[in-house]
Amino acid sequence: MPGIDKTDRAMTSVTAQEALDFHSQGRPGKLEISPTKPMATQRDLSLAYSPGVAVPVKAIADDPATAYDYTARGNMVAVISNGTAILGLGNLGALASKPVMEGKAVLFKRFADVDSIDLEVDTENVDEFVNCVRFLGPSFGGINLEDIKAPDCFIIEQRLREVMDIPVFHDDQHGTAIIAAAGLVNALTLTGRDFKTAKLVCNGAGAAAIACIELIKAMGFNPENIILCDTKGVIYKGRTDGMNQWKSAHAVETDRRTLAEALDGADVFFGLSAKGALSADMVRSMGARPIIFAMANPDPEITPEEVALIRDDAIVATGRSDYPNQVNNVLGFPYIFRGALDVRASTINDAMKIAAAEALANLAKEDVPDDVAAAYQGNRPRFGPQYIIPVPFDPRLISAIPMAVAKAAMETGVARKPIEDLKAYGQQLSARRDPIASTLQRIVERVRRQPKRIVFAEGEEVQMMRSAIAYANQQLGTALLLGREEVMRETAEREGIDLDRAGIQIVNARLSKRVGAYTDFLYSRLQRKGYLFRDVQRLINTDRNHFAASMVALGDADGMVTGLTRNYSTALEDVRRCIDPKPGHRVIGVSIALCRGRTVLVADTAVHDMPTSEELADIAEEAAGLAKRLGYVPRVAMLAYSTFGHPSGERSERVREAVKILDRRRVDFEYDGEMAADVALNARVMEQYPFCRLSGTANVLVMPAFHSASISTKMLQELGGSTVIGPLLVGLDKSVQIASMSAKDSDLVNLAAIAAYNAGT
C-alpha cells in the first residue's frame, strides 16, 4: 500500500532474523493490555468487577451514550483485516496479516494516543465479513479497515458505514488520498496552478487511486481534467475490457488510449501502480513545472534522482521516507481518528477528510518554530518544492489535524459531543505527544545525514555484533567491531551473523598499526598516576575499553559504546583514563524515563554518589542542557524527602543550598526546590505551593544522591511499566555511551545513535 512506509529503503537492509527477533523478544508481538485503574486491594477488585461493575452496567442500559463515560470505548479503534491484500505481499490470509495489524495499532497509540486492538477476520466472503464487524460495533469508538483487496474493500466499507453509527475508515483508500491531496494543494500553489485548470493523470485504478480521485474531485478539482489509467490503458467512456462500476464512475471522453498519450502535456502525475511505470519520455512530455507523485511502494514509479536527470523543474513526492515529500498515511489516520473520537463522531465524512488535507497542507506553509525545527534535524524547512508535506515526526501534527477534523465534524452535524472550549482542547492534544520517540527518530535522521564511525568495544559479544550490524543497516555510519577476528567469525557463523556486509569493520587491537600511538598517548596521561610504560602497553593490547577510548580520543573513531561485560562504574573509570570532561562541564549520567506519555529526565544516575551542593547545581545545569539539546524546555525540580523546608534536615539543606547556587549563577532555565517527587510531578499537589517557580510539572528531576536516582529509575522500569533509556553519559569531551550489562540489542543501537549524534553536535 502506498501509505505507511512499512517497506521503505531504510528498512530494506533489515535482515529476516532481525525482524523475527524484534517480534519475538520478550513478550511476543507488539501489544499488551494494561489496566488504567488500581487493582491492588479487594476493594479495587470489588469496584472493577462484582459487585461494583453492576452500577455502570445499569447506567449504560438506561443511557447507551454513557458507555463513553464508563468504558474505554471512546478511545478504542479496531484495526480489522482479512489479509487479502497485505502490503505488497498479496493475499496471505487473515492470520498472516496479524503482525501488520498489530503494527497499525501501535502507530495509533504512538502518534495520537488512541488505544487500538487488531482483529483478523478469517473469511473472504463479503457478507460474512460485514456481519462479523457490524456486530462488534458496541466495543469500539471506530473501525479502521486495512489490507482488504479491491473491489471488496469498497463494498465492505460502504455497507458498514450504512449499518454502523461509528466511524468506519478504510485507510488504504482514504489515508493515502488525504496526504496526496494535501501535497497536491501545495504543489499547485507553488506552480501557479489551481484545481479548475490543472490536468491530472492517475496511473493505477485500485482502492487508493480511486479514493484519491474522488477526494480531489470533492475538493473542487475539475473532473474533465482527470484521466484514470490502469494496466490496460486509459479508462475512457465506452471501454468494456477490465471495467467495474468504480472505474466506470471516472471514465472520461478522450481519444487518448495509453498512459504515454494521456501524459502528453499533463500537469500532474499520480502514481499508485508499480515500479518503473513512468518512463523518462513520459516525464519529458509533461507540461512545464510538472508535479509527479510516484507513490508506489516499496519502489516508486520513478525516483527523484531519475526525474532530476530528465528535467530540473519538477516537484516530486514518493511513498518513501528517504526522499523529501513523503506521502505517508501515518500523517493522517491517527489524527483523523483522534479528532473523530474526541467529538464522538458517527462517521468520517468528506468534509472531515478535506479538513484533514487542508490542515496538513497549511502546516507545511507555516513558519517552523525552534522547537519544531528539531524534528527536521535542525535544518529548518521552508515551504517549497522540497517541502510540500510535513514529516511524520512533526510534533505540530497532533495539534493541527485532530482540531480541524473535530471542527468539521461539528460543522457538518456528525459530532455527538461537540467541543465547547477549543483552546483547552488544543492544549489537551499537545499533551498527548510522545516526545522521546520523536527525539530518537530525529537523532537517527540527523546521523543518517552525517554518518559516524562508532566503536562497539565488546565486539566478541553476540549482542554487540547484532547491534553493530543494525547500526550499519540503518545507514548511521560505520560500525567498528573491536576484538579478535577469529573469535568473532566463529561466533558469527554459529549465530548466523554476516560480518562481511557493508558498514562493518573489524578491529583487532593486537594487530592494529595504531597500538604505538595509543600507548604513547595513554602513557602521557598516566605516567604520573602510578602506571609504568609496560602497564599502559598491557592496557592497550588487552583491554577493549582503553583501546576503544584511545581510538576516540585520537580521532580514529567518532564515538564508542561499551558496558555489556563490566559494570557501569568500572567501564566509566576505563574511559576517563583516556578522555577528560569538557572544559567547564561535569560528567554525569542522565536517564530518560517514559511512562504513560510523560517523559522525565533523571540525574545523576551514574557518577556522583553523594553530591555536594555545588555538584548538585552542576548536575542540574548538565541535565537541563541535555534536555534542551533533545528539544525540551527544561523545568528542573531539585528533589529531596522534604518540600520547601518541611520537614527540615541536614540532607535537605544540601539541596536548598544547590538552589541558591543556581540563583547566583542566573541560569537560563526554570528550576526550584527542594521538593518531594509528588510535588514535582503532580500538578494538583504543586498548586498547594503557589510560590513555586516552575510553570508546570517538572520534566528534569535532580536526585539528592546516586542511590536514590538509580533505585528510582530501576523501579520505574521494573514495576511501573516505564521505558528507561540510559543512563546517558553527559559532559565528556568525546562521545561515549555506556550500556547496562542487561541491555538489549535495541538499547545498544539507541546508545550508538546517541553517541553518533553527540559526536556531530
Swiss-Prot record:
A divalent metal cation binds at E146, D147, D172. PROSITE patterns: MALIC_ENZYMES (PS00331). SMART domains: malic, Malic_M. NADP(+) binds at A205, G206, A207, A208, N297, N329. Its EC number is 1.1.1.40. One of its GO terms (biological process) is malate metabolic process. Divalent metal cations. Prefers magnesium or manganese. Its cofactor is Mg(2+); Mn(2+). In the N-terminal section; belongs to the malic enzymes family. Homooctamer. This is NADP-dependent malic enzyme. It comes from Rhizobium meliloti (strain 1021). The lineage of its organism: Bacteria, Pseudomonadati, Pseudomonadota, Alphaproteobacteria, Hyphomicrobiales. The gene is tme.
